[in-house]
Amino acid sequence: MANRIQMGSIWMDCSIQSPCFRFEPEEHFPFDSPANIEIRDSTSSPSDIIWVVVNNKLIAARPVMHTVSFADLQELNLVHGYEVSIDGQWYQIRMLMDLDEWLLALEAVGEDDHIWHWEQCQSFLQQPSGNGLRVLCTDSRRLDQPDMVMRTDRRQQTGWRPVLELARKPDFQKLEVGQKLLCWGWQSLVNGILLENGTYDLVLQRQDGTDISPKDTATFASPAMDDQVIVNKSAVAGLRRKSNGIKSRG
């Protein structure tokens, strides 16, 4: 079962958008300048982005915008990406690197369309195509093969599926005993109340929404007595105070 987190919002020209939105307005011409796209803090609304916890990063559960070209995304610096602050934590936001990253994510949590919403839609890849006019994207029919589209084409079935990776270590010193926390790493998610903030570990009172993969117990988080969880600080790929409005969606 995939662990999911709903946090962060996407805005176009200062208006919040709901994934998956149309980047090119109906009245735009194909080569109009792209709109301004921003990733901002969570709004605690259904418009916040849903992410899948997989391979020590977050990958959007669906493309967040469609009818956008690879050239648009380059101009917006959304291919290789940049650092962005979401709810006080800094991440690197970028496009999927290559087909291997996509296939490894599917292998880790399953190919279920209810998780990834990959049927009938494609996601751009950074992976070079070997053709200056065309770029690669995932294929909505054959998962193990990339498809190729024109660099400047805006197509409804092709979109931007962002990836979030931790850019700066969480400031554990700011955490306070008694706080409700949500932290994740590899394929696992821990939801709980902070009991101890040690030198190397966090000890949390487990709450609903916690799901620890057996493969992650030796590296990220392990169950303890009295329904507690010990989290290895060095393996945390993201951590948030629940007061920020972040929702876990197991």
Where are these predicted regions, by residue range?
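Glycine-centered tight beta-turn/hairpin loop motif at sheet-sheet or coil-to-beta transitions
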Residues: 54-56, 185-187, 207-210
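Extracellular-facing segments of soluble proteins and assemblies that are Gly/Ser/Thr-biased and enriched
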Residues: 55-91
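GGW-centered surface loops in extracellular recognition modules
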Residues: 1-60, 163
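Intrinsically disordered, low-complexity, charged/polar segments
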Residues: 210-250
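Basic/aromatic-rich interaction segments and small domains that mediate binding to polyanionic partners
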Residues: 191-217
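Short, surface-exposed beta-strand/loop "edge" segments at domain boundaries and coil↔beta transitions
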Residues: 64-72, 188-190, 209-214
